[in-house]
């Protein structure tokens, strides 16, 4: 029986707007013996919904998007009693998590690494019942990471967060 892989893609994430490189990744998974099902997210929270609803039926899950897509996918998988292994292809505007693991921004190269690797365990934190894999934040500039418009993040990367944070400077109060 063929191995199965659910490929969750956020088409709105920074670099995933060009699907050509993603086709190479899907082709690689197929060459490695996986029957691949591709699902594109359509709204915030959709990656979590897909991972939870469909994840148990697959041998492996791979998500492609930014840090938010990864976090959503992990959130959905954490609701399963026995989640399958997860691979991550960075496709967001800043990809902080991928940079911390030295993952390639090239989808085909990362796909090869996913299939060649035995994987590694990563810690998953939880705050108020919400899982996270990279960052849990609070404080003065937390809003900036959620409020920066996607189009600006796509164009400016990390600078978009800085510009969004400047908007809050006048509202800061000393403690």
Question: Which stretches of residues belong to each language-model region?
Answer:
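A residue-level signal for conserved active-site and pocket-lining positions in enzyme catalytic cores
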Residues: 10, 67, 142-144
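Short amphipathic alpha-helical segments
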Residues: 19-21, 74-77, 99-101
């Amino acid at each position: 029986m063929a191995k199965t892989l659910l490929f969750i893609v956020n088409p709105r994430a920074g670099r995933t707007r060009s699907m050509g490189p993603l086709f190479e990744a899907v082709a690689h998974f197929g060459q490695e013996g996986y029957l691949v099902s591709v699902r594109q997210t359509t709204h915030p929270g959709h990656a979590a919904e897909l991972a939870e609803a469909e994840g148990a039926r697959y041998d492996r899950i791979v998500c492609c998007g930014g840090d938010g897509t990864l976090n959503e996918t992990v959130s959905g998988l954490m609701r399963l009693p026995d989640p399958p292994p997860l691979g991550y292809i960075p496709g967001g505007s800043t990809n902080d998590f991928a940079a911390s693991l030295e993952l390639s921004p090239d989808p085909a190269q990362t796909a090869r690494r996913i299939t060649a690797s035995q994987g590694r365990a990563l810690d998953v934190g939880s705050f108020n019942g919400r899982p996270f894999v990279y960052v849990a934040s609070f404080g003065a500039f937390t809003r900036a990471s959620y409020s920066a418009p996607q189009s600006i993040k796509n164009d400016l990367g990390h600078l978009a967060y800085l510009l969004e944070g400047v908007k809050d400077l006048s509202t800061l109060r000393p403690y």
